[in-house]
């Protein structure tokens, strides 16, 4: 569609044509001017830039704001608007294209100068990362530098901890196996309860001491069983009676006459019968003493012994020693270190046999 132009609009078109005919070294010859767009668009794009911009060099980005170049942009915009089907959409898109073109030219002209002075964004990011601590991370996915080291340290520590646990487990297994072997060797008195480690060591010590005592006997371990406690007391009284020559000698003589006058009685089973030669009396002969016939002598001999010890301090103190030895031979109740008494952990086989 052809549109009629007013006289004022025609004059402006002619001025634009004169500007295009002027020779410009940095532009190619332009085609003939297209028909002028409507007056509304020209009114909007009236040159508002100062004329001093036309004196700038072509390399300066501000030279694109000069009126001559603005005329070229206006003519191209008018040609584009004439061939566009929708005027409203083209009017809105034309200023955007101009702004985009100017921005690209400004970036191209200023890119060469600024690239040599300022480093790129990647270099700036690397420098900042080095200042922060040394971990460089790119958008494309760079590997970290400190994370693998921490993982390696954790792995080494875990391996060391597992190795230490395995060594401790093997040590405890070996110790328990050794205690089991020791429990099988020492006597347990048919006790269903499993002995603790402390009780096992204590029983082993007692058992070893008993075996060493058996080996130190002169008969090679074939010593007779010890007499009962009643026989031991009779031996003690007979020793004390034999040490005196006074009233004790008269009592032994009377006992000897009674034994020779009567028939000899058999020894009951389980009793103690010990015969030994007493020292010579005033008559000059020795007799065999029977301990079973001196039931009334025990109290008198003990009284005489205590009286003699009180009267004569020079009497040796070994007379009362056998009594103390008999009391000490009974197995005392030793207590465990933890305060708990174990009846089976303080006696040996020799004590049971006696």
Curated annotation (Swiss-Prot):
GO BP: any one term: transcription by RNA polymerase II
Domain called bHLH: residue spans: 159-211
Keywords, ordered alphabetically: Activator, Deafness, Developmental protein, Differentiation, DNA-binding, Neurogenesis, Non-syndromic deafness, Nucleus, Transcription, Transcription regulation
Major subcellular location class: nucleus
Gene name, Swiss-Prot/TrEMBL: ATOH1
Protein name (record): Transcription factor ATOH1
A Pfam family of this chain: HLH
Quaternary data: Efficient DNA binding requires dimerization with another bHLH protein.
Biased composition (Low complexity): 108-122, 250-264
Gene Ontology CC annotations of this record: chromatin; nucleus
Example GO molecular function: DNA-binding transcription activator activity, RNA polymerase II-specific
Originating species: Homo sapiens
Record disease entry: Deafness, autosomal dominant, 89: An autosomal dominant form of non-syndromic deafness characterized by progressive hearing loss, with onset at birth or early childhood.
Compartments where found: Nucleus
Its job: Transcriptional regulator. Activates E box-dependent transcription in collaboration with TCF3/E47, but the activity is completely antagonized by the negative regulator of neurogenesis HES1. Plays a role in the differentiation of subsets of neural cells by activating E box-dependent transcription.
């Amino acid at each position: 569609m052809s549109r009629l132009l007013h006289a004022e609009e025609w004059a402006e078109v002619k001025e634009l044509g004169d500007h295009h005919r002027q020779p410009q070294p940095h532009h190619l010859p332009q085609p003939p001017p297209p028909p002028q767009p409507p007056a509304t668009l020209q009114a909007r794009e009236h040159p508002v830039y100062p004329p001093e911009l036309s004196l700038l060099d072509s390399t300066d980005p501000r030279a694109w704001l000069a009126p001559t170049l603005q005329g070229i942009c206006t003519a191209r915009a008018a040609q584009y608007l004439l061939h566009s089907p929708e005027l409203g959409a083209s009017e809105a898109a034309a200023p955007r294209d101009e702004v985009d073109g100017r921005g690209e030219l400004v970036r191209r002209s200023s890119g060469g100068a600024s690239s040599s002075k300022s480093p790129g964004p990647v270099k700036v990011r690397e420098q900042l990362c080095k200042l922060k601590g040394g971990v460089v991370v790119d958008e494309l996915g760079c590997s970290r530098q400190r994370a693998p080291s921490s993982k390696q340290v954790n792995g080494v520590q875990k391996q060391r901890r597992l190795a230490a646990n395995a060594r401790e487990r093997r040590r405890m297994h070996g110790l328990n196996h050794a205690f089991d072997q020791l429990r099988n060797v020492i006597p347990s008195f048919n006790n269903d309860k499993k002995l603790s480690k402390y009780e096992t060591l204590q029983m082993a010590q007692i058992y070893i001491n008993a075996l060493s005592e058996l080996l130190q006997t002169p008969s090679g371990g074939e010593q007779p069983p010890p007499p009962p406690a009643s026989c031991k007391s009779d031996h003690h009284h007979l020793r004390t009676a034999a040490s005196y020559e006074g009233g004790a000698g008269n009592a032994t003589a009377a006992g000897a006459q009674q034994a020779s006058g009567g028939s000899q009685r058999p020894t009951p089973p389980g009793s103690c019968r010990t015969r030994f030669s007493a020292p010579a009396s005033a008559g000059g002969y020795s007799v065999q003493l029977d301990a079973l016939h001196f039931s009334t002598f025990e109290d008198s001999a003990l009284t005489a012994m205590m009286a003699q010890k009180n009267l004569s301090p020079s009497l040796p103190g070994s007379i009362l020693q056998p009594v103390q030895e008999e009391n000490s031979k009974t197995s005392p109740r030793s207590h465990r270190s933890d305060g708990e008494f174990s009846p089976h952990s303080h006696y040996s086989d020799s004590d049971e046999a006696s």
